[in-house]
Amino acid sequence: MSERIIYTSVFGGYDNVVEQSSDGWDLKCFSEETHMPIYEDNNRNAKKFKVLPHRYLKDYEYSVFIDGNMSVVGNLDELVDKYLKDSNVAFFSHNNNYLDARNCPYQEAQTILDLGAKNMKLTPERGMLNYKDDPYLIQKQMTKYSMVGFPKDNGLITGMVILRRHNEKDCIETMEDWWTEIKYGSKRDQLSFNYCAWKNNLKFNYMDGDSRDNEYFNRSTGAHIGKK
């Protein structure tokens, strides 16, 4: 067994999983075929494994989570050695995304709410399905963050790829808090990670480049085949 693993988590046929190959790395896909779903919401069923590798991958020191529609095209050993050298967690920054740069969960929340309201005018028959998540939960969550002093413009992750030394104490504590936010708040995990990192004083790194356009990962277009 390797000390390093690449894994993904797909429930409800949302992603057409891309086959992976990376020398020296074990591979795993969590799904309803390997683990019984607990929640009616496939998104949360998948994100439990995404967020909590310390519960399910204890025998590994390093993990790289990737969305099911992502493929590895670069040297992961090089990536992990670079970004987990002085921290136990690393993400791509949403602010480096060419198409939709944002640097704040509050901005992300407002974008989701604005898009939902726009869609509601265009297709009112879809009702709340016009929103990526329950707008009440999103607003409630952002209000809570503001009330406890979480600052604006404090960074925003993209959750497509996560590098972790997942058995380390600071990582475990932050991931458990992150899962609590996703479980009881919005399922949009980008809204809550930076808050949890701030709350736990977690040091983490941002990888260079656009999460959709970089030398290590490729995102397959049209790979989403189901509903979260």
Stretch-by-stretch model annotation:
Residues 1-62, 184-188, 199-202, 227-228:
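N-terminal anchoring/stem segment of glycosyltransferases
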Residues 11-14, 34-35, 70-72, 96-98, ...:
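Short, solvent-exposed loop/turn segments at secondary-structure junctions
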Residues 16-19, 74-78, 216-217:
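A short acidic (Asp/Glu
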Residues 54, 77-81, 196-197:
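Short active-site loop/helix that positions an aromatic residue
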Residues 61-70:
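Short beta-strand-to-loop acidic/aromatic patch adjacent to the donor-nucleotide binding site
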Residues 120-228:
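Catalytic core and acceptor-binding pocket of nucleotide-sugar-dependent glycosyltransferases
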